[in-house]
């Protein structure tokens, strides 16, 4: 379980990462997820990687995106990134990434720009295809571009005045 209570991101009993913290969260994710991609491309080259479960997640993401079920979509997007890490068979990578995923989802729920047409399932699909192509450079560009777009889709000028119910991010 994720604990935000002891972190400095709590303001009046409500978690709210700042712009700088959000950018740092994504910077840390890039460092970890680039390692994930490197391992997965190598495993795929050695025929040691089964991506059927990940393919299924992306298909579910696409169908939920069309139904606009944001809570389930957010959960699936989190599951996608953690599932990729789990395919590395390295508990330290998974445990390093685990707290960052919900923190980035929390930031997205606070700073979401409703004008943005960001669509993660297409980038998730492109990332999987890059891994399947055994092209590490292409796969690294795909994950970096995806995480950069996640940050670019946020509007840090928004005032977080709504009482966000973010419980779905931590279930």
Features from the language model and the residues they span:
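Short amphipathic alpha-helical signal-transduction/dimerization elements
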Residues: 36-37, 41, 132, 151
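Charge-rich, acidic-biased intrinsically disordered regions
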Residues: 51, 103, 108, 133, ...
């Amino acid at each position: 379980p994720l604990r935000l209570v002891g972190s400095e991101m709590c303001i009046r009993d409500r978690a709210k990462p700042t712009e700088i913290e959000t950018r740092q969260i994504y910077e840390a994710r890039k460092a970890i997820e680039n390692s994930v991609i490197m391992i997965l491309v190598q495993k795929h080259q050695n025929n040691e990687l089964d991506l059927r479960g990940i393919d299924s997640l992306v298909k579910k993401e696409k169908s939920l995106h069309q139904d606009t079920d944001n809570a389930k979509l957010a959960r699936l997007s989190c599951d996608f990134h953690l599932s990729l890490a789990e395919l590395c068979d390295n508990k330290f990578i998974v445990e390093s990434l685990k707290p960052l995923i919900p923190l980035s989802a929390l930031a997205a729920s606070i700073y979401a720009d409703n004008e943005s047409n960001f669509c993660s399932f297409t980038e998730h699909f492109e990332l999987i295809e890059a891994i399947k192509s055994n092209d590490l450079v292409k796969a690294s560009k795909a994950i970096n571009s995806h995480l950069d777009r996640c940050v670019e889709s946020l509007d840090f000028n928004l005032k977080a005045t709504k009482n966000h119910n973010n419980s779905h991010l931590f279930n």
